[in-house]
């Protein structure tokens, strides 16, 4: 049945079958009830309730509200600050222009934010989110569509989600599940949440974070900060002066181009500076350190340096430095006294660096030399920095 309103504010109720409801101009209330219904709100601030069935709705211009209910619904907001609740079912939601608010609900939803600043919570299910242009996701800000204070990022909810920030400075969070989260263009906050996640900051100075699970994170272009939680993670800084932190697990962290700072955290990690003048800090665990090209600093700091032995794989004499920090070491000396460090040759052809902190506790660093180009005689105080 085709049900038509006027250019005033109408209330139109559908039947138990498949209906077509037209609101025209005015602030209309359209409710489909049962059946696979079609809604056309027209101009004005409309409220569209799908009910049971697979419904299709266009809000038109104005600040519209959509309530999907049961069924696989398709809603299009148009111009205005629109509010979407997909309800149960695998829904497709289009925000259009304006600052829109999305709740996907249950089901495998697709959400397209469009232009403007969006709040998106995809809910349960394996969802796909395109945040669109604009600064999407909020942190202690007023949601333009609802007028409420919120701290919600663009969130995937439960399930294995794909989230695309596209343009703008976005806040994106995968939440639970094995998610793919892409920041796109802009200075984005990308949080994978729990699960085994793939994170890509894209262009811009991004902040990437993940919690439990085995994750892969790429900073992309820009000066990025990446921290991965528990799990054996892969981290790539790519272009820019990046800060990479492994935290828990046996991680592999690669700085990429430019001057990076890489911290292994807990676990037996592999750190690669790659191109640029990099700072590598293994922290806890028996770590493998590759400086890469240019002058790099290998840092051994505090109690972490005393707990285990790290291995430097590509130390270049006269180019790279060993920074001994917060151990009370102040000189290169073979005396074995507290506060000293020195090097000796091993029977395997490598170089062992041994030092003693201010209270006489020993620490050691292995300098691997597979090409037999280094010897303890190459080392002197000029290879060390003390702090």
Predicted regions and their residues:
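Low-complexity acidic/polar repeat-biased segments
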Residues: 1, 339-387
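Short beta-strand elements of solenoid repeat domains
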Residues: 2-4, 11-13, 20-25, 29-34, ...
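Short small/polar-residue motifs
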Residues: 10, 283-287, 324-346, 380-382
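Intrinsically disordered, low-complexity coil segments
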Residues: 138, 143-155, 357, 370-375
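Acidic glycine-/aspartate-rich tracts in secreted/extracellular proteins
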Residues: 302-306, 315-332, 358-360, 370-373
